[in-house]
Amino acid sequence: KAREAGEEAFRGFMSKHANVEIGLALRSDRWAGADFWEQQGRRVSLDDILQRADVVTVGIDGGGLDDLLGMYVIGRDRETREWLGWGHAWVHETAVVRRKSEASRFQDFVACGDMTIVRRVGDDTAEVAEYVRRIHEAELLDHIGIDPSGVGQILDSLAEAGIPDESVVGISQGWKLGGAIKT
């Protein structure tokens, strides 16, 4: 019955009743790009992007002691013009304790290399800055888009890594970003 109702209904049924974790929840109000997300599933590393790209941009969303710090790197393949992406998240061990219901998911992300659990405040932003430094030193960095709310420590870490201030652009989240995401 669920299969006949469509992909979204089938995924929901399998998730709820067969204990199958589904990669994307394809709700009716989903982002339009979600329909194409899984078919683009080839894993790309940061090193792949550094070797193949002619330009790279970085997006950073700051976290805090009870939230994730996320970084996403997008590079354009110099031969195919295909966009390549790699992301990583950091979470402080305090957040793992506070969000016990998410702890096993955090561990899954750690196990596949997509997340780091940090013990000391500042280790996360130092690692972000190190990744950005590598991109900058490869002379591929165009700009860094960052939500300007509460990012002092990230900006300090980027400056300490030698990233020029003019490379950082504030991109507010919420309604200001919503229109661009829907295209």
What are these regions (language model features)?
Residues G41-D48, V55-G62, A129-I135, L141-H143, ...:
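Generic recognition of flexible, low-complexity loop/linker segments
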Residues K1-E4, G85-V91:
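Conserved acidic
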Residues L68-G70, R81-G85, L155-D156, I181:
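Extended hydrophobic-aromatic, low-complexity segments
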Residues Q51-D77, W83:
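Gly/Thr-rich phosphate-binding beta-strand-loop-beta motif of the actin/hexokinase/Hsp70
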Residues N19-L24, I60-D66, G75, P148-G150, ...:
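Short, flexible loop/turn elements at secondary-structure junctions
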Residues A89-T183:
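Mg2+-dependent endonuclease catalytic cores in nucleic-acid-processing enzymes, primarily RNase H-like
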Residues K1-T57:
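ATPase catalytic-site recognition across NTP-hydrolyzing enzymes
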Residues Y72, R78-A89, R98-E102:
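Interdomain helical connector at the RecA1-RecA2 junction of SF1/SF2 helicase-like NTPases
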